[in-house]
Amino acid sequence: MPVYGNKNAFVGLVIELRAIGPVPIIIGQGICGLVGTSNRGPTSEAVPIGMPSTGTRLYHSGDLKEAIELAFQQGCPVIYAVRVLGKGNKKASKKVKDGATTPSEVGTFYAASEGIWGNSVIITIEDGEFKATDVEIFAGDGTAGPYALKVCDIIESPRNYVKVNGIPRTIVYNSGDLGEGKVYVDKVNGTITFYEGEEPTTAQTISVYVKYMTRTVTLTDNEMTETYRNIRDLIDLQARLRTSALANFVPKAGALHLPANSTFALEDGSDGQEIVTDDWEEALYLLGNTIAPTTVAITSYEVEPSSYDLIPVLDGFVTWMANRFQPCIGFVSARENESVANLLDLAAGYNNRLLVIEGNGWDQSNPRKNLAVAHAAKEAAVALGESTALAMNSLNGVRDLLVTFNQDEMDALTRGGINVFMKQRGIKPYVSITTATDWQFMRCVDNRTINWIITALDYVCKQFYHQRRTPEVLTALKASIEGILDEQVILGNVERYHVEVMPNEIDVNRVDVELLVQNIGHIERVRVVFGVGVLPKE
């Protein structure tokens, strides 16, 4: 706590500034994480996607691109995407040089993302439509030069000038014309040279104003073409290509000249080794270390055929996230046309309130849409306490179900921990369940509320670490917890709760909190006693 004033003063003011009272909280919600394969796109980062067109531009085609589009169709406001690619993957690239007499490297073009697709990118550099101006002021060094300018490919212009201490020198563009009172401007190499005997001293200032050619850079992969016109320098080139879907540019340290006109293809791009489960695991943990999503979906269920080897990877990931007080629900679809018996056998190996296995998670679109993605996005999009099994929350953008189950099969699968979809004025979950066997943790809607409370508790408790364990502070801690739960009661997400905050009697640095919460119920069964006959008069 800050202390203001001098405690040693005989007469004076000392102020101890303390934080008191309950803590308000702000918790991010509505974030869906997607992990999958695609033909292109970044592999070393979890990319925030704000609109479907961004996903299409970055990932081009493949499961991840389709998943991003489907997730946005569910009304999910924010999506983070991670592309899975094998180890040893590499971006296609090409080093470029300037147009000087002895060319120097000025930077490297890189494909916008890793993979062999980058080898199809062709780059054309040519003169821009407009001229640019280079203005420089620097001190002489006592020699005639040459003095290197920041630009090359200089244009002869009546507006060009070179001055020494404000006195202009006559510009010549041929070294053989250099003479008294003149300065030679080398248009190709971007240098100036003074006449012998008229060398600027270290006490004199050289002022230069010259016109030079800009560059227009065209990128194409024979499907998409991007053109960037009238680029003035390397920094401008780097900035203009920063959001390109095809290629980026990184200047070489110390380089100043624009690259020479040329046409070339990027090369040496690689997809790396075959994708294995470790690659999916790394992608998931990259997502978890970047953002705390509400839900996560993976676009595939296995790497090795008939193994379902990605489900345990997702199972472990969501458990790890919960252990960090950032719980999220993970969604994965089972194999297309899987039998009821095999689905029940699959679910028997899992008991996790944060894992959802979709029994009939594919539609009839071409390509088929992954309903695990749609379900994850819908769970992230709906309000806390609202079930995605509501008819009004039916999945959007899907075309029928590839497989439908009858009532007995849906009941058996639901009891066995497999979530199933039904077609009834829209395609929606029958109940929307996880693989958990305890009824308290069976439904996704209840787990989203539980996850929100866990995240809120972590946020609140962090505000009280290392504070004095006084009755005042404990009261504020209790009020903070009550504040978040009172709001959920008002919103109809929690029916009632009980909270106690007590100092531990043995450990003076510990506080014990007892929290009991009853989630709001969601009507699934209705029993009617229907009496028929003569009713007694009131």
Feature-to-residue mapping (PLM):
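A glycine- and small-residue-enriched flexible loop/hinge signal that marks low-structured segments
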Residues: 1-137, 150-198, 202-468, 475-478, ...
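C-terminal edge-of-domain segments
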Residues: 505-538
